[in-house]
Amino acid sequence: MSLDIVPVDKRHLKAIMAIDAQVYPTPWSRRLWQQELEREHRLYRCAVRDGSVVGVVGVLLVADDAHVMTVAVDPAAQRSGVATALMLAAAEEAIAAGAKALTLEVRVSNTGAQALYRRFGLAPVGHRRGYYEPDGEDALVMWAHDIDGPEYEARLRGIAAELDVAA
């Protein structure tokens, strides 16, 4: 089963929105997705397996920071390397676009996602109280710095090698 990471376009929206609705309590609307895809300084990629969209990642590029805004994987495809492949593609493309740091927020209860992000060198630096709606759960703020350097490049090569072995 091959996994392709491709740029998101409007033909992917129905599948992406279905995934969003399964994994997020307040999924993005079609209008918001369309607006995001049209905005500058955005990087949206989806994972396609056997012709079906199984995940999506979205990044906002601001100055030399890359802010991961969304990572969503179809529940049936979770724990199969999809999120890792999406994060790898996002990190590589953000670096190519000039990013020197990677940041995101993640639910404090989402320990699985936190472990994934730690693999990418993201470390907790703070909390945002009541960040997530509708339940008011706190967000853990995570950052990775110097992602344009040789140590981070080696980290990404290691992750890519693990993905190749798992495929």
Model-flagged regions — what are they?
Residues 7-80, 87-97, 145-149, 155-167:
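Acetyl-CoA-dependent GNAT
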Residues 105, 118, 123-140, 152-153, ...:
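Conserved catalytic-core motifs of GNAT/GCN5-like acyltransferases
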Residues 74, 78, 105-109, 134:
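Residue-level recognition of the GNAT/N-acetyltransferase active site
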Residues 94-105, 128:
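Conserved GNAT acetyl-CoA-binding A-motif
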Residues 30, 34, 108, 131-132:
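Conserved beta-strand edge residues that scaffold enzyme active sites
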Residues 87, 110-113, 130-135:
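Short glycine/proline-centered loop/turn elements that form peptide/ligand docking sites
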Residues 42, 101, 107, 133, ...:
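Conserved catalytic core of the tyrosine transesterase superfamily
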Residues 2-4:
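Extreme N-terminal starter segment of soluble prokaryotic enzymes
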